[in-house]
From Swiss-Prot:
ATP binds at residues 170-177. It is found in: Plastid, Chloroplast thylakoid membrane. It is a peripheral membrane protein. It is an enzyme of class 7 (translocase). It comes from Pinus koraiensis. F-type ATPases have 2 components, CF(1) - the catalytic core - and CF(0) - the membrane proton channel. CF(1) has five subunits: alpha(3), beta(3), gamma(1), delta(1), epsilon(1). CF(0) has four main subunits: a(1), b(1), b'(1) and c(9-12). Produces ATP from ADP in the presence of a proton gradient across the membrane. The catalytic sites are hosted primarily by the beta subunits. GO terms for cellular component: chloroplast thylakoid membrane; mitochondrion; proton-transporting ATP synthase complex. One of its GO terms (biological process) is proton motive force-driven mitochondrial ATP synthesis. Disulfide bonds: none annotated. This is ATP synthase subunit beta, chloroplastic. The keyword Plastid applies. The gene is atpB. Pfam families: ATP-synt_ab (PF00006), ATP-synt_ab_N (PF02874), ATP-synt_VA_C (PF22919). The lineage of its organism: Eukaryota, Viridiplantae, Streptophyta, Embryophyta, Tracheophyta. GO terms for molecular function: ATP binding; ATP hydrolysis activity; proton-transporting ATP synthase activity, rotational mechanism.
Length: 490
């Protein structure tokens, strides 16, 4: 049996609390420590040594279980290739800590808070542990307020709550990334806020594409990196489950610093929240826990709650979270999406049909929902306008079959008017984005909520029945539609 170096009485080692690897099962390590020197749950452990090929090894693990017999079970945050039994393991005495603050903006990090963008080291003087309790109830800002995004379809029909959680549903190629980048741009310009993007268990190519598009659109400023509007944290598909399970907490920790210390409004993007659950399920099985429904971890609700409850508004600032939600096999009753839905305040659904028509953002106005769309929260005027828009679009949807076969001429005069207004509304829900200027050549538009409401009221009332549909396509506020008519004469 290997002697624990701690027992040898070497003072330098005693100070650091050293153990050794007793067993390795994939990304899970069992580590032996001396009696009385056991690390705490969630403590960060560092494995140091030389691999079988002579390469230097530095692996960080997180303690998950205390097994008895002076052993702990830990999950590795990086590949365990080259590790052997008997290797030295140092207990850092604290949970994993990551850099926070302005130094993180414009940079890409891994789960450990290490920069992975080849732009040199990060100023890590200010760090914060990734495991924290949610803010106390007395610190919360319980006032219900709308988070204005400047995007017409979102603000009118499925408004976001300040400090709320929003689910973003959409397949490939319907504009999720562009919508995310526009939100990052708008919070920076209109609210003086910053954003943190957590790539959880998605494709490495997508992470790279997002980074390149952010640089191209100016969200990340290569010349003045500190003036960038977003910090990126990636734990992609090829990472071990421990990294994918914790990368969301790393991103959240960076966002919490901007909220609590800088007192800013923060947008936190998590893509994809399902992968967070999936990674937790893998780790749970590796730790030997009995699986629950559909093979998920028995601690599913607890893990989801501990992440989601930290995303909230306090009296200092807010974290508003937008989470892409993958629904396995389109089954909304699957425990992973079902547990996520319990925490969401709004859903933004992107439609391939609208994208095919060229209407961007391709947000489905009838499928997207929000708990904030209540008359006592948004006001009677906003609520009535939103309901009028939805009723008009719903009637248009019901008439589609008649329009497709016999044609518009078979409709009553009233229905023809509804169809004409619905088509104008559909086009007015489109909007030129700031981050898409480089692709479209059209200058981006931020539309305030009152301007949005006024525009849709004018369409619903019939004031603009004389304008063509094309006048409403890709404009900002309603005045631009009338100006376009006068300038083109159409």
């Amino acid at each position: 049996m290997r002697t624990n170096p701690l027992v040898l009485g070497v003072s330098a080692l005693v100070e650091k609390n050293v153990g050794y690897i007793a067993q390795i099962i994939g990304p899970v390590l069992d580590v032996s420590f001396s009696p009385g020197y056991m690390p705490n749950i969630y403590n960060s452990l560092k494995v140091q040594g030389q691999g079988t090929a002579g390469q230097e090894i530095q692996v960080t693990c997180e303690v998950q279980q205390l097994l008895g017999n002076h052993k702990v079970r830990a999950v590795a945050m990086s590949a365990t290739d080259g590790l052997t039994r008997g290797m030295t393991v140092i207990d850092t005495g604290a949970p994993l800590s990551v850099p926070v603050g302005g130094a993180t903006l414009g940079r890409i990090f891994n789960v450990l808070g290490e920069p992975v963008d080849n732009l040199g080291p990060v100023d890590a003087r200010i760090t914060s542990p990734i495991h924290r309790t949610a803010p106390a109830f007395t610190e919360l800002d319980t006032k219900l307020s709308i988070f204005e995004t400047g995007i017409k379809v979102v603000d009118l029909l499925a408004p976001y709550r300040r400090g709320g959680k929003i689910g973003l549903f959409g397949g490939a190629g319907v504009g999720k990334t562009v919508l995310i980048m526009e939100l990052i741009n708008n919070i920076a310009k209109a609210h003086g806020g910053v954003s943190v993007f957590g790539g959880v268990g998605e494709r490495t190519r997508e992470g790279n594409d997002l980074y390149m598009e952010m640089k191209e659109s100016g969200v990340i400023d290569e010349q003045k990196i500190s003036e960038s509007k977003v910090a990126l944290v990636y734990g992609q598909m090829n990472e071990p489950p421990g990294a994918r399970m914790r990368v969301g907490l790393t991103a959240l920790t960076m966002a919490e610093y901007f909220r609590d210390v800088n007192e800013q409004d923060v947008l936190l993007f998590i893509d994809n929240i399902f992968r967070f659950v999936q990674a937790g399920s893998e780790v749970s099985a590796l730790l030997g826990r009995m699986p629950s429904a559909v093979g998920y971890q028995p601690t599913l609700s607890t893990e989801m709650g501990s992440l989601q409850e930290r995303i909230t508004s306090t009296k200092k600032g807010s974290i508003t979270s937008i989470q892409a939600v993958y629904v396995p096999a389109d089954d909304l009753t699957d425990p992973a999406p079902a547990t996520t839905f319990a925490h969401l305040d709004a859903t933004t659904v992107l439609s391939r049909g609208l994208a095919a028509k060229g209407i961007y953002p391709a947000v489905d106005p009838l499928d997207s929902t929000s708990t904030m769309l209540q008359p006592w929260i948004v006001g009677e005027e906003h609520y009535e306008t939103a309901q009028g828009v939805k009723q008009t679009l719903q009637r248009y949807k019901e008439l589609q079959d008649i329009i497709a076969i016999p044609g518009l001429d078979e409709l009553s005069e009233e229905d023809r008017l509804i169809v004409a207004r619905a088509r104008k509304i559909e086009r007015f829900l489109s909007q030129p984005f700031f981050v898409a200027e480089v692709f479209t050549g059209s200058p981006g538009k931020y539309v305030g909520l009152m301007e949005t409401i006024r525009g849709f009221q004018m369409i619903l009332s019939g004031e603009l029945d004389g304008l063509t549909e094309q006048s409403f396509y890709l404009v900002g506020n309603i005045d631009e539609a009338t100006v376009r008519l006068n300038s083109t004469g159409k």
